[in-house]
Amino acid sequence: MVAVVSIATDRLTKVFPDGTVAVDGVSIEVGSGEFVTLLGPTGCGKSTILRLVAGLEEPTSGRVLIDGEPVRAGPGPNRQLSMVFQDYALYPHLTVAENIRFPLSLGPDSPAAASARVAEIADQLGITGLLDRRPGQLSGGQRQRVAMARAMAGESRAFLLDEPLSNVDAGLRAELRTEVAALARRLEMTTLYVTHDQVEAMTMADRVAVLRRGRLQQIGPPGEVYRDPRTLFVAAFLGTPRANLLQAAIYAPDGGVLLDLGSQLIELPPGDPRVRPLRERHTERVTCVLRADALSPVPDPSGPAPVLRGVVRSVENLGHEALVRVTTGTVPTPSGQASLEQPTSGQHLSELLADDLPAGHPVRDRLARMIPHPRPEQPPATARTEYGFYPVYDPELRGEPADAGAVVIRVPMPVLPRVGEPITLAVDLDQLLLFDTSGDRIRLG
């Protein structure tokens, strides 16, 4: 096998004839021997990037570079990249041994040398006993190993893998992802791996590149991308269960900051280091991201941590822990959590609220007692310049307002809350992530 190489894309763009922008100016570098995953939902452009790198598609603009040198269009020998497809692409009329040997038949190796190479690779992947079978006689996991073996057989300079485990059952998938990652590292093979499965991406890769609508959102080590997401999409896409996304408005009285969630508040006291960057955003709408482990049940709400109050809506027992869904009455993001879309941009709180809050609105009443705030004279009918935030639900959410602002938390076994009972949740402010109306991270220090 020849020396492994680095792979890079330079402002790579692909526009299909119907006008679909599949890849939009993506620049990624994969170092020699590095394992990088391209992660994102269906249609984000990750498989198209892989095909562009392999030479199976021609870019509309931009370049693919191997060891820093641009490569010409087409999948010719100047690339020497082995690709493993989602459907394995094995020849059904050939035996396993013949499938593995196929790329060697195109090179200078003698039949004896090729057979020795096949035997060596089969032993490495534990498929020696399958060499005389045909693909139709193999399980999904066995076919995947054969596809990997064929990729290893030629003089490959890098592996390109397009969702290779998506057709494998869940029980075998965990085993195979460990095998694939270990094999790539043992061979010190440069690997570009496409997946929509965040578990695969986070457990296998040296670095993860998160894509959305053809654009690179963020790239970095898995732990860094998870802990320090740059955009709302990355924060929402990574993590199981999905992060809780709540709409809030910033109110900055003297000294401190209040995050107004519609029916509840998260208060940051004057001495909190997060206050200063938020005071400049008085009345702005933001999205609060709280992962499941940022919220924990507490029996006594009088502690130093801010709390959210709610009612248990459902309990999903997973054996070692439970996922508990709690209705808080707070405001979900305008476009809904399921779509992972960013909030609409460019508006301040005063432009987003109805003209009048309902009588007895708890946040308004509480704030009025805490911080007197005069009503402006003859405010415009479409603007609100006083504090307060009143829930306005998306059409998709109007049918179930009782579940608005539901959050999911992790609860250890064996003591679990019951459906319908009230619950108080402490908020870990160190895990609170805030994003502006364009979906960009607000740095809190």
Task: Describe these PLM feature segments.
Residues 8, 29, 65, 424-426:
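ABC ATPase nucleotide-binding domain
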Residues 54:
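Helix-to-loop junction immediately C-terminal to a conserved catalytic motif
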Residues 60-63, 213, 432:
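Conserved coupling/switch loops of ABC nucleotide-binding domains, chiefly the family-specific signature
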Residues 62-70:
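Conserved ABC transporter NBD signature motif
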Residues 74-238:
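ABC ATPase nucleotide-binding domains
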Residues 254-445:
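Non-catalytic connector elements of ABC transporters
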